[in-house]
Amino acid sequence: MDWTWRILFLVAAATSAHSQVQLVQSGAEVKKPGASVKVSCKASGYTFTSYDINWVRQATGQGLEWMGWMNPNSGNTGYAQKFQGRVTMTRNTSISTAYMELSSLRSEDTAVYYCAR
């Protein structure tokens, strides 16, 4: 596979054994530069609308980078300046799922993407 023309998106599931809180994300994706990707994060074990959802990412060998937050109850969002205009965070409360869409992808967007409560 020609990695110079594709962008790899990895996502991870976060769980808490004590409270059975789970955030289960969609699987890995490979996208071409300029494309968009939409990552899902399905919550269970708590009231989805009671806690903000944050999205962060981590590129290989780098630290965590905060992308933004969303209030699942109101739908209000706040995005890191770096991603303004490229990121959109939404939710579907009926299925307790949050979404993060990133557009105009570039090679630097290759990372593991996490949702966090």
From Swiss-Prot:
UniProt-annotated stretches for the region Complementarity-determining-3: 116-117
Domain (Ig-like) ranges: 20-117
Intracellular or extracellular location(s): Secreted; Cell membrane
Gene3D superfamilies per the UniProt record, alphabetical: Immunoglobulins
Keywords: Adaptive immunity, Cell membrane, Disulfide bond, Glycoprotein, Immunity, Immunoglobulin, Immunoglobulin domain, Membrane, Secreted, Signal
Pfam families xrefs: V-set
Complementarity-determining-2: region residues: 70-77
Residues carrying sugar: N92
Disulfide bonds: C41-C115
Biological role: V region of the variable domain of immunoglobulin heavy chains that participates in the antigen recognition. Immunoglobulins, also known as antibodies, are membrane-bound or secreted glycoproteins produced by B lymphocytes. In the recognition phase of humoral immunity, the membrane-bound immunoglobulins serve as receptors which, upon binding of a specific antigen, trigger the clonal expansion and differentiation of B lymphocytes into immunoglobulins-secreting plasma cells.
Subunit structure: Immunoglobulins are composed of two identical heavy chains and two identical light chains; disulfide-linked.
Protein name: Immunoglobulin heavy variable 1-8
Gene name of the record: IGHV1-8
